[in-house]
Amino acid sequence: MAIGTSLLYDGLVVGGSIQVFEDIGTVRVIAFGGVGNPGACRAQLDELIGLINPTLLDVSFEIDLVLQMPACRAVVRVDESATQEDVAADVIRTLGSVTANFAAVAPAFLAITADNKSVNEALSLVRIPEGAKKSLIGGES
């Protein structure tokens, strides 16, 4: 089962997917959006993602093989004793986190795919939200 989302976040339309894997007790949450043609710039995007991922705690970026575009993802582990409300709250919180992280990094993806900027130039465009925690693109806790 998958639930699709579409959110307007900081002026950017970000799509999302919530996929439940009941057999293994996890929910995969991803956020993605249109950031140009990633196929033509795959090496630079991989390098950018390689620089960003080590700074993150709860989420990670990848080039999604199905979507063929950058995506931010996280996994919610479902405790058997958790209530449905607790699981729903964790999933919604995680969707917010992956969406915020994707929106923060989207300008860097666009700098590479649309403006042919270098990886270092693109990295300087990552927008860290004011007062963000480390799980939101390396901010302070």
Q: Across the structure, where does each feature detected by a protein language model lie?
A:
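Short, internal acidic amphipathic alpha-helical interface segments
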Residues: 32-69
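Ser/Thr-rich, low-complexity intrinsically disordered terminal regions
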Residues: 1-14
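Well-ordered alpha/beta subsegment
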Residues: 63-96, 103-111
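Hydrophobic residues embedded in beta-strands of well-ordered beta-sheets
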Residues: 1-3, 25-27, 68-70
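A generic beta-sheet turn/junction motif
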Residues: 9-11, 22, 65
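Beta-strand elements of well-folded, non-transmembrane domains
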Residues: 9-11, 35, 76-80
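Intrinsically disordered, low-complexity regulatory segments enriched in Ser/Thr/Pro
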Residues: 17-39
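Short, highly charged C-terminal tails/helix-capping segments
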Residues: 107-141
